Amino acid sequence: MEEDRVLSSVHSTVFKESESLEGKCDKIEGYDFNQGVNYPKLLRSMLTTGFQASNLGDVIDVVNQMLEWRLSDETIAPEDCSEEEKDPAYRESVKCKIFLGFTSNLVSSGVRETIRYLVQHHMVDVIVTTTGGVEEDLIKCLAPTFKGDFSLPGAYLRSKGLNRIGNLLVPNDNYCKFEDWIIPIFDQMLKEQKEESVLWTPSKLLARLGKEINNESSYLYWAYKMNIPVFCRGLTDGSLGDMLYFHSFRTSGLVIDVVQDIRAMNGEAVHATPRKTGMIILGGGLPKHHICNANMMRNGADYAVFINTGQEFDGSDSGARPDEAVSWGKIRGSAKTVKVYCDATIAFPLLVAETFASKREQSCEHKT
């Protein structure tokens, strides 16, 4: 009798009755290759694959929500709307304002071409990057970056004048070509500052470099052409900073005003209303925080997508999940957010394929 009681207790513990999840959660099911190779369906199946594949599927959903949102989706509040904002045609034309941030290593990689595609077709509204994210774009117009290996010895590469970025190799000659190209531009900027009272800011400098490079492979060129602002808070950290340093010895006096740029950057968020704002941030560091901080000025972004491999246990901003930014007012509590823990060189091209690129293809097909 006692044994039966114990067995019954153990049985009820092991086989505890479950709450039904039917209709509440997606069933986990991967792509069936018996259907043939269909890449759009494969990408859509990520949502129900599990782990970071599901997070990638969620990222795709959130970005598509950014792209599909229109002011006409919102209820009109007459007391808060201008006459223009009450017009149905105007409301249908107002889209989400998208901030794109990325670190320099992604421009060193082939993700540069994905970024260039977005900028070329004016699919994003504001860009924030690091100095490396600027100079690597320009340098690639002058000379290529090559595939190497993560394990190549640093001392050996140094003896050959080769710089390693992960498993990429950048010959030091590339930076020599960069110096030859950019110093005359600094000279001309200084002349315009003195003779025409031009007030240079980091974003004005980057627009000028985009104009001067005049190369369609460059995202900076397309940002200049499309009048998309590119902000770089840490302008002097990198080869571009080295060039400014060397130039200051040749002829002093070139001034670049960062205060005007913080007003401009924060203004992009503050004056976005009545638009919603969305953040797509690849990697962490300065671009991630600069975009989030600007959106704090408007009580937070409405959509946020983070793609990086950073962890939050060390308290770094780079590794923080979107929910931490909610606590600061940088992302709204009601926002659609997701972070995918993945190398952005893998995740971002797949994301663009199933969002920006597919929607552009559909739009082109509809027009024809």
Curated annotation (Swiss-Prot):
Cofactor: NAD(+)
Binding-site residues, spermidine: 135-136, 242, 289, 315-317, 324-330
Family: Belongs to the deoxyhypusine synthase family.
Summary of the function given for this chain in its UniProt record: Catalyzes the NAD-dependent oxidative cleavage of spermidine and the subsequent transfer of the butylamine moiety of spermidine to the epsilon-amino group of a specific lysine residue of the eIF-5A precursor protein to form the intermediate deoxyhypusine residue. Also able to produce homospermidine from putrescine.
Protein name (database record): Deoxyhypusine synthase
Cited PANTHER family: DEOXYHYPUSINE SYNTHASE (PTHR11703:SF0)
Pathway: Protein modification; eIF5A hypusination
Organism in which the protein naturally occurs: Brassica napus (Rape)
Record has Transferase as a keyword: yes
Reactions listed under catalytic activity: [eIF5A protein]-L-lysine + spermidine = [eIF5A protein]-deoxyhypusine + propane-1,3-diamine
Keywords: Hypusine biosynthesis, NAD, Transferase
EC number(s) given by UniProt: 2.5.1.46
Active site positions: 330
GO molecular function: deoxyhypusine synthase activity
Binding positions for NAD(+) per the UniProt entry: 104-108, 130-132, 136, 237, 284, 309-310, 343-344
Source superkingdom: Eukaryota
